[in-house]
C-alpha cells in the first residue's frame, strides 16, 4: 500500500493523499485553473518544485505568480535565463554564480573581454527569446564524479570548484531548461515562460571570484524582475526618484560633506553638514536627558580586551590594528580602534560594586567606531569605515527586561515620528542554531520579548507592523530590529534592541542581589539611529534635502535686492541669529532672481528678501523652498513665526 501523507491546506481543511503525489498533482486535484497558474508549492513554508513529491505530512500551499513569494522564483529563474542567453551569444563564456538579491538578481561571468552596458540590450533580447521558448525546468541529481566530469568537459572550471565546496552528504542538483543546464539548489518554476517579460538588465560591474581580491576578476551583470510590468515600471520610477535624492549628490549641492581618496570611508564634514550632525546629536541628547547616563569609552584599547569580548576571534579582520612598543616591556603591544562600544560600557559598569537597587543602569554614548569595510562596499554616508553610533547599554534584572524593552520601543518610535517616519516594522529574531546560553535562558528571554512584541502591536493600534524571524537572532541573544519606510517606499533597518547573554559572562560583570549574592545582569544593546552618518544619509534622501526648518543646517538667508538695503539686511540677520536661528546675509551684487535660484538649489528653507521698501518699512518678503508664494511681514512678526516653526518637536511637546 502506498504511503499516505496528511496535508493541511490554507483554509484549514485536511486531506490524506499518496505521499508520492507531486505539487502539480495536488494543484490539479484542486482545480485545473489553479494547476495552470501554479509555479511552485510550499511545504511548511519551504518552497519546492511543482515536480517534487510531497513525501510527508504537513501544511501545503500552492504558489502562483501573484503570491509575493513567487518573486524570488521569478528572479532566480531570470538569473538562469540570463546565463543561458550569455552562453548562446558568447560561447566559451564561463558561468559562476547567480543568486537572487534584494529587488533582483545577478550573475557573474568569466570572459576574456568584460561585458559593457552596450551588451545589455542584446542579452535582454535573447532572454526574451528564451522566455518565449517556454522550456520546462527539470531536475536531476547527479553523482559527484559525473557532475565534475561534465562541467570540466564543458570548460566550466568555476563550477568544478563549486562542486568541490559542496559537502559530501548533500545532493548535487542539476536543473535543465531545455538543453541548457546549471548546478543549482533550486527550486524553480515549471517553465521559462512563467518568468514573464517584466525584467530588465540594469548594470555591469567587476567582482572578484569568491570576493577574494587575489582571485580572478569576473563581470557581474545585475538585473531586476517583477511579477508584472506595472511593478517593474514602479520600481524603475522609484530608482529614478532615488537618483534625484542621492545623498552624495545633494551633499555636494548643499555643501554638507565630501569624501576623498586619502581617507576612504571617512567623512569630511563641511560647516553646514557638521551643524546638521550636531543638530541630530543635540536632539538625541535631549531625548536621553534624565534617563540615560552619557559616558565616553576609549577609542583605542589593547587587543586583550577584544580577546576577552570575543571580537578578536571572529571580527579581527574587520578591525583597525596598530602595534606599539612599550618602553617598559620587551614585546610590542597590539592595540585596536574599537569597532563597537559595548565592551567599554561593560568596563564602566564593572567599575565599583553595583546593587540590585542601582538597576537599571542605562549607559549611552555617541561613540566613534571604526570598521574595515571592503573598498567596493563603501557607499557615501550609508557604508563607511569610521562612524558614530548612538549606542546605549542597559544593565538590568530579568524582572526589568520587559519594561526596559517597552521604554526603548517608545523612544525609538517617537524619535522616528519626529523625523517624519510613520511606517515602521518591528521584527523579532529568535534563537539561531549556534548560540551561547542555555535553552532555559533563551526560553525565558524569548517569552518575555514575545510578550513585548504583542504589546508593541496592541499599543500602536495595529499601526506598527510586527513579525517574527525564526532563527535570525544574534548568537548572544534574541533581538528586535526596527525597519522604517522612507518617502519613496524604501525600507531601512536602523534601530535595534538586543539581549546579550555573552558579554556580562565573559567580563564577569555582576551585581549584588537582595539575598547578598552575586548575580549576572541582563545586558541590552540599544541603538536608535545606529550609525549617525547613515541615518543622516537616510534623512537627506527622505527629505530630498528639503529639511523641516528645525533641522535644516542653514535655516534662513537674507538676500538683498539692491545695495541700499545692505545695512538693513545685516540688522535682520543679526536679529535672526539673536533669536537662535541659523542665518546668513547675501549682499552680493547679483540679481535677486539669481540669488533666490542659487539658495533654492542649496535647499535653504526660507529666503527673506530685502529691498529699499522693506528697509523703510521694517519688513521682509518671505519666500519658502518649493513654493512660488510670497508674503510680506513686519520683521518682528516674521521672526516670531520662524522661531515657532524652528522649534524642535521634542521641545514643542515639553512646552505643551
Curated annotation (Swiss-Prot):
<protein>
    <recommendedName>
        <fullName>Threonine--tRNA ligase</fullName>
        <ecNumber>6.1.1.3</ecNumber>
    </recommendedName>
</protein>
<comment type="function">
    <text>Catalyzes the attachment of threonine to tRNA(Thr) in a two-step reaction: L-threonine is first activated by ATP to form Thr-AMP and then transferred to the acceptor end of tRNA(Thr). Also edits incorrectly charged L-seryl-tRNA(Thr).</text>
</comment>
<dbReference type="InterPro" id="IPR012947">
    <property type="entry name" value="tRNA_SAD"/>
</dbReference>
<dbReference type="InterPro" id="IPR018163">
    <property type="entry name" value="Thr/Ala-tRNA-synth_IIc_edit"/>
</dbReference>
<dbReference type="InterPro" id="IPR012675">
    <property type="entry name" value="Beta-grasp_dom_sf"/>
</dbReference>
<dbReference type="InterPro" id="IPR045864">
    <property type="entry name" value="aa-tRNA-synth_II/BPL/LPL"/>
</dbReference>
<dbReference type="GO" id="GO:0046872">
    <property type="term" value="F:metal ion binding"/>
</dbReference>
<dbReference type="InterPro" id="IPR012676">
    <property type="entry name" value="TGS-like"/>
</dbReference>
<keyword id="KW-0862">Zinc</keyword>
<feature type="domain" description="TGS">
    <location>
        <begin position="1"/>
        <end position="64"/>
    </location>
</feature>
<keyword id="KW-0648">Protein biosynthesis</keyword>
<keyword id="KW-0030">Aminoacyl-tRNA synthetase</keyword>
<comment type="subunit">
    <text>Homodimer.</text>
</comment>
<dbReference type="InterPro" id="IPR004095">
    <property type="entry name" value="TGS"/>
</dbReference>
<dbReference type="InterPro" id="IPR047246">
    <property type="entry name" value="ThrRS_anticodon"/>
</dbReference>
<dbReference type="GO" id="GO:0000049">
    <property type="term" value="F:tRNA binding"/>
</dbReference>
<dbReference type="InterPro" id="IPR006195">
    <property type="entry name" value="aa-tRNA-synth_II"/>
</dbReference>
<dbReference type="InterPro" id="IPR004154">
    <property type="entry name" value="Anticodon-bd"/>
</dbReference>
<feature type="region of interest" description="Catalytic">
    <location>
        <begin position="246"/>
        <end position="548"/>
    </location>
</feature>
<keyword id="KW-0820">tRNA-binding</keyword>
<dbReference type="GO" id="GO:0005524">
    <property type="term" value="F:ATP binding"/>
</dbReference>
<dbReference type="InterPro" id="IPR033728">
    <property type="entry name" value="ThrRS_core"/>
</dbReference>
<dbReference type="InterPro" id="IPR036621">
    <property type="entry name" value="Anticodon-bd_dom_sf"/>
</dbReference>
<keyword id="KW-0694">RNA-binding</keyword>
<dbReference type="InterPro" id="IPR002314">
    <property type="entry name" value="aa-tRNA-synt_IIb"/>
</dbReference>
<keyword id="KW-0067">ATP-binding</keyword>
<dbReference type="GO" id="GO:0004829">
    <property type="term" value="F:threonine-tRNA ligase activity"/>
</dbReference>
<comment type="similarity">
    <text>Belongs to the class-II aminoacyl-tRNA synthetase family.</text>
</comment>
<dbReference type="Pfam" id="PF03129">
    <property type="entry name" value="HGTP_anticodon"/>
</dbReference>
<keyword id="KW-0547">Nucleotide-binding</keyword>
<dbReference type="Pfam" id="PF07973">
    <property type="entry name" value="tRNA_SAD"/>
</dbReference>
<dbReference type="GO" id="GO:0005829">
    <property type="term" value="C:cytosol"/>
</dbReference>
<feature type="binding site">
    <location>
        <position position="342"/>
    </location>
    <ligand>
        <name>Zn(2+)</name>
    </ligand>
</feature>
<keyword id="KW-0436">Ligase</keyword>
<dbReference type="Pfam" id="PF00587">
    <property type="entry name" value="tRNA-synt_2b"/>
</dbReference>
<dbReference type="Pfam" id="PF02824">
    <property type="entry name" value="TGS"/>
</dbReference>
<dbReference type="InterPro" id="IPR002320">
    <property type="entry name" value="Thr-tRNA-ligase_IIa"/>
</dbReference>
<dbReference type="GO" id="GO:0006435">
    <property type="term" value="P:threonyl-tRNA aminoacylation"/>
</dbReference>
<feature type="binding site">
    <location>
        <position position="525"/>
    </location>
    <ligand>
        <name>Zn(2+)</name>
    </ligand>
</feature>
<keyword id="KW-0963">Cytoplasm</keyword>
<keyword id="KW-0479">Metal-binding</keyword>
<feature type="binding site">
    <location>
        <position position="393"/>
    </location>
    <ligand>
        <name>Zn(2+)</name>
    </ligand>
</feature>
